[in-house]
């Protein structure tokens, strides 16, 4: 297994990226793998990474959050992101991981690595925490604000295969995000997509409302990127608000502090459940190789989780399974 890693992408790069790589390789001390850290050699070396399985690939440019994505990918040929994507295109790496500019990662993936034949619109897909602890794969959350009904079918197939082979769910339950659970609910897109999803080679269980998205009753939720991104931001905001409110209440007086001390193990588990860092990054599905978008504010734990996610996708040959499913379709 070989991973190309954009060492300069993200708010805390390259330190968080290098520290995440350290944690990742430490988890697999005896496993054969090759990791390519792409970026500023001097800065990367300053964090003391010493593992024969890690190679630093020099890149003199950085694509920042202020750069226009497509223009940056075309003009900054020696940027860490573009060089990493080229490694995947040339077959020197099996997957790409980056915490950098989302739009630039999408552009590099499309223009350099390329789309899977038959997939018109790739989808960005994180895993949300659920009440049951199993997680739910949601796609699309922003790669494409608009979509056709046929695209949602592609999302369902890709999400189902990912949930099965990466999340370990035997028969993933696929649902369509909607404003009601009845089959006739929704706008023109959801009404057109519903019967197509019923005929798709997935275990489609109908519509799901946003309030039930994290119940654990479904394993995959499909939607267009506009609604998906609103759902994502709502979940992130609600989780953040909940943790802040709990912290405020449990530190308000001595009795509350004692209660927090007693409940500390359970509170820690709750925090881990809601912590995006534990769930890896968002997979960009529909690309010719696994591409993982780590959160821009990723720390070492989040990077390690994203690398694990990429490893599982490579180990289980998820992209090839998607290609075969589309060929049959």
UniProtKB/Swiss-Prot annotation:
This is Phosphate acyltransferase. It comes from Exiguobacterium sp. (strain ATCC BAA-1283 / AT1b). It catalyses: a fatty acyl-[ACP] + phosphate = an acyl phosphate + holo-[ACP]. Pathway: Lipid metabolism; phospholipid metabolism. The lineage of its organism: Bacteria, Bacillati, Bacillota, Bacilli, Bacillales. InterPro entries: FA_synthesis, Phospholipid_synth_PlsX-like. Keywords: Cytoplasm, Lipid biosynthesis, Lipid metabolism, Phospholipid biosynthesis, Phospholipid metabolism, Transferase. One of its GO terms (molecular function) is phosphate:acyl-[acyl carrier protein] acyltransferase activity. GO terms for cellular component: cytoplasm. Belongs to the PlsX family. It is an enzyme of class 2 (transferase). Its EC number is 2.3.1.274.
């Amino acid at each position: 297994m070989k991973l190309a890693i954009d060492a300069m992408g993200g708010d805390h790069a390259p330190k968080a990226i290098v520290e995440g790589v350290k944690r990742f390789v430490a988890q697999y001390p005896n496993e054969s793998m090759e990791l390519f850290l792409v970026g500023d050699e001097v800065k990367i070396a300053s964090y003391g990474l010493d593992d024969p399985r890690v190679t630093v690939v020099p890149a003199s440019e950085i694509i920042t959050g202020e750069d226009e994505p497509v223009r940056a990918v075309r003009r900054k040929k020696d940027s860490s992101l573009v060089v990493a994507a080229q490694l995947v295109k040339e077959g020197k790496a099996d997957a790409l991981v980056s915490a950098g500019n989302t739009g630039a990662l999408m552009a590099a993936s499309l223009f350099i690595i390329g789309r899977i034949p038959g997939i018109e619109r790739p989808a960005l897909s994180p895993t949300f925490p659920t009440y049951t602890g199993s997680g739910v794969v949601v796609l699309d959350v922003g790669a494409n604000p608009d979509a056709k009904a046929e695209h949602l079918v592609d999302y369902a197939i890709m999400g189902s295969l990912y949930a099965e082979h990466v999340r370990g769910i035997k028969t993933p339950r696929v649902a369509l995000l909607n404003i009601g659970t009845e089959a006739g609910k929704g706008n023109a897109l959801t009404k057109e997509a519903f019967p197509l999803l019923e005929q798709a080679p997935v275990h489609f269980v109908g519509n799901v409302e946003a309030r039930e998205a994290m119940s654990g009753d479904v394993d995959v939720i499909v939607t267009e990127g506009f609604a998906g991104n609103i759902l994502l931001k709502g979940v992130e905001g609600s989780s953040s608000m909940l943790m802040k409110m709990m912290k405020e209440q449990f530190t308000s007086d001595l009795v509350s502090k004692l209660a927090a001390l007693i409940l500390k193990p359970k509170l820690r588990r709750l925090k881990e459940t809601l912590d995006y860092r534990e769930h890896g990054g968002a997979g960009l599905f529909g690309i010719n190789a696994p591409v993982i978008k780590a959160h821009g504010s990723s720390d070492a734990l989040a990077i390690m989780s994203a690398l694990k996610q990429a490893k599982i996708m490579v180990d289980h040959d998820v992209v090839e399974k998607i290609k075969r499913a589309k060929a049959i379709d």
